[in-house]
Amino acid sequence: MIAFARQRTRICCLLVTLAVSFVMSACGGPDTLIAGDIAFVDVNVLPMDSEHVLEDQVVVIQDGRIIAIGSADDIGPEEGVEVIDGDDSYLMPGLTEMHGHLPDPRQSDVDIRNVLFLYVANGVTTVRGMQGDPSQFRMREQIRHGLLTGPQLYLGSISMNGDRVSVAAEAEQRVREYKVDGYDLLKVHEGLTVEAFHALAETAKEVDIPFGGHVPDAVGLRVALAVGQQSIDHLDNYLEALVPETFQPDSPVGLRGVGELMAIVDESLMSDLVEATVNAGTWVVPTMVLWETAFFNERGSVEVLSERPETKYMPPETVERWIKAVDDRLETTDIDTNRRVAALRRSVLMALHEGGANIALGTDSPQIFSVPGFAMHHEMALYVELGMTPYEVLEIATRRPAEYFDAVDDFGMVAEGQRADLLLVTGNPFEDIRNVANRAGVMLNGRWFSATEIDNRLDEMARFYGN
């Protein structure tokens, strides 16, 4: 009798549990509650593992990592978790700037903080710095420990150029020195001799440190590809490589002389260059907008300024230098030639893209009218204008850089285990790339910055610079 009563009790408890579960389900409650620090609810997730959107999702963050993603029917945040209501917005990975410049240590603390925040304000959560300085190691540690607000940093070395490296022995010495210092890659610049470049490449392979950046004119594109340069930035030396061997000038023409080559380039060589790039596995970081604004421009500073209101977040003396650089360049070059060079660069980029080359997004900020973070949106818009799909552009701004760094398990997607480096935007970027700029907020390593907080900080910066 007692056993029967216990059995009846267990059955009744089971029925009550089922009834409660049925009521919770009928009322729309989630099946599982997840503990964490912060949870996004009512968001549409762009995972960036492929071109699809996960609608009405809950994303839970703990200790700076994504720990759970699921539909609102399946999971929800436990009581006490801070909730960010996405209000049907779109949650995507943070952007990666693959050719950025970090604040000069000679700048004031305010200017340093401002430059770093400009990246974050625009959803740029990782930056590959391409002009090294010893002060950047401290900056990186301050960011890692939350003492300074800024993106995750990968540090390029002090410039390997002709002034610092004149012979092969110096190249070998610098490579070993920068590896020990802790730089993530070697920044290659102009002026290296063929011998010094080969010594750099051989020593870099020996000590296991990648190198990238410019292609020294004396070396040339094909040699750089052959010896394993990891990235070629600015499409450096691609136009020169389109000149047939029989017409190669006796000495390098340099950046300012590229226009002279337009009469002798042979675009039929482009497919061979694309194939060589793909076979080498080299990454290309084109920095298109800067080059068309500063070097192969057909517009003066007044017109550029009218399209770049974000210059109000830069020191006025910096903007004045930019104005002078653009106008001086326009006065000393032929606009038609600039237009032809820019068009050929666009053709090279699209040939590389369509041929399957590795491409990553970079802007060379802060340089001439390329304001950190904001310049990323201009660069992405241009790529779509040239014929890439929004998804393809987002790939090269998020997941593909993580592949470059061999860090696909760490960042570049919205997935469990990834860093909580996220950008919340109000419209679907797959439909219009300009929606990436319509931020509702940014999460940086698990720390949330609402659009209001970002806008207030930007307003303070503008006032600080007298705008």
Annotate the PLM regions.
Residues V23-A26:
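C-terminal motif of bacterial Sec signal peptides marking the signal peptidase cleavage site
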Residues E177-L185, L192, V243-L386, M461-Y465:
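Active-site neighborhoods of metal-dependent hydrolases
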Residues V45-V58, S71-D74, V371, T389-L394, ...:
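Acidic, glycine-enriched loop/beta-strand segments at the rims
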Residues I2-V16:
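Bacterial N-terminal signal peptides that target proteins for export
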Residues V115-P134, G150-M160, K179-L192, I209-G212, ...:
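Divalent metal-dependent hydrolysis catalytic cores, especially in the metallo-beta-lactamase
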